[in-house]
Amino acid sequence: MRKLLSVIYYEYVMQLKRIATWGVLAASVVITLLDGFPSEKNLARIEFLLQPSYFIYRSLSFGALIATFGLMFLLSNRMAIDHKTGMKQLIMASPITKLQYIFGKLLGGFIYTYTVFSLFLALNTLVFYVSVPIDIALTDCLVPFSKALIINVLPVSIFISFISVALPAIVDVRLFYVLASVLFILNAASPDSADKMPFYLITSGDLKKLIWQHPKFPYINTDGIQANLLFLIGCGLISAVPLFLRRKLWRND
Amino acid sequence: MKQIKSELMILGINPILILAFLVVVFTLIAIFAGEMLNLSLIGFEVIFPFIAAIFIGEWGKIKADDNYDMIAAQGKSLISWVLYRSVTVFATVTFFVVLCMAIVFHIRSEIPLQEMILIYLSPAFMLSTLTVLCNLIFTHEHVSTLVCGMIWLLAMLSKSMLRYPMTEYIYLFIRYSGDRNGIWLINKSVIIAICAVIWTGICLVYGKKNR
C-alpha cells in the first residue's frame, strides 16, 4: 500500500509542478470569464447570468471543455515518458508490482485531473461571487459548486485521466490525439438543448442539467443522465483494462 | 528532392497508416451518417485542418527533435530544414485529405471538390503555420499540438464572437459557422495573407541563424 501511495504521490506532484498545467488552467479560466464574466454587457446578453448555478452550468459547457482538452494532452505521455527517460527500468528494478505501477499512474492522474478541474471551477465561481453586481449569499454559490464537484467533475476526471494515461500506452499517441480530436470536435459542435443530449458529451452532457435547468423545461431526462454517466465512467474504466492485460508493459515476475 | 526523400523516410509508415485509417473512417461516416450532417464542411474545414496541425506538431518536430542539436550545428540556417520537414508532412496529409474529399464527394456530393479544397486549405495552412511556430519555440514534445489544439477548440467554441464587426474576416471556420454575409472567399484570402506574414517573419528570423 505504501508503495502504491508513493507512486500516486510522485505522479501527482510531478504533474502539478509542470508549468503547462498552470498554463492550461489559466487559459481556460480566462476564456471562461471572457464568455461569462458578469459584466454589464454580458448580463444584458446572457439571460440567466445572475444565477450562480447557471454560471457554473455555462462554465461546464465552455471553458471546461478546453481545460479537459489541455489536461488530456498533459496526461497522455505519463507512461511513455518513463520509458523514454529510462525511469521505467529503474522502477522495474525496484520491488514495485505491475498492479501498483498501473494503479499509481491511473490514480495519480485521476487525483491530478480532479484537483485542476476543481480549481478551474473554484476560481471561476470565486471571481463570479466577487464581481456579480447583486448581493448573493455564499451558499448560493457553494451549493451548485459542490454539486458540480460530485456530479460532473468526478466522472469527467475518471474519463479524462484513465483514457489519457491508459490508451497512449497501448496505441500510438498520435493516433490517440487524432481520435480524441474527433471526439472533442463533436463535443464542441453539439448545440446546447433542453432535449436529450448525445451520450458522448464530456463536460456538456445531460449530467450538467442536474446543476441548472431552464425554467421553461423543468424536467430531468433520466435516460440521458444515465447514458452520459455510463459513457464517462465506463469508457474510463474499460480503457484501463488493456494496460493490465498487456504483458510487454512489465517484467516477467 | 533528396531531402524530401529523407524526410519521407524519417516520417515512416505510422502516419500513413493513421491517415489511411482516417480515410476509411470518413468513408464509413459518409455512407452511414445520414443527411442531417454536412460532412464536407465539418470534415474538411474543421477536423482535417487540425489533423494536419497534429501531424506537423508530432512528426514535424523541430526543437523537440532528439537530433536537433546535431542538425542545428551542421548548417548555417534552420529555415531549409524547417521548410522541407513541414512541407513534406503537410503535403502527405493533404494528399490523403484530397483522396478523402474525392470519396466524400462521390458518395454525398454536398459541395464541389474544388470548393472543398479551398475551404480546407486556409484553416489547415493557418493551424499548421502556428504549429510550426510552436515547434520552433518549444523544446518539449506535444506542446505545439496542445497549443494549436486549444486554439482550434476555442475557435470552434467561440462562434458567438462573430457578432463583433470584422471578426468574420479572420474566423477560421467561416463556412461551418454559416457565412451569413457571403464573404468566405475574402475570409480565406485574409487568413492565407496572415499565414504569409507569419512565414515571412519565420524566414527573416531563422534565415540567418541555426538556433
Place the predicted regions along the sequence by residue:
Chain B
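Helix-loop-helix units of permease transmembrane domains in multi-pass membrane transporters
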Residues: 57-90
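Aromatic- and glycine-rich beta-strand/loop motifs that create alpha-glucan
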Residues: 1-20
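Hydrophobic alpha-helical transmembrane segments of polytopic membrane proteins
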Residues: 115-141, 194-200
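Hydrophobic alpha-helical transmembrane segments that constitute the membrane-spanning cores
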Residues: 83-109
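Long, hydrophobic alpha-helical segments
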Residues: 40-63
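Aromatic-anchored segments of alpha-helical transmembrane domains
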Residues: 23-31, 94-102, 149-160
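Short, hydrophobic transmembrane alpha-helix segments
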Residues: 28-40
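Terminal transmembrane helical anchor/hairpin motif
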Residues: 144-211
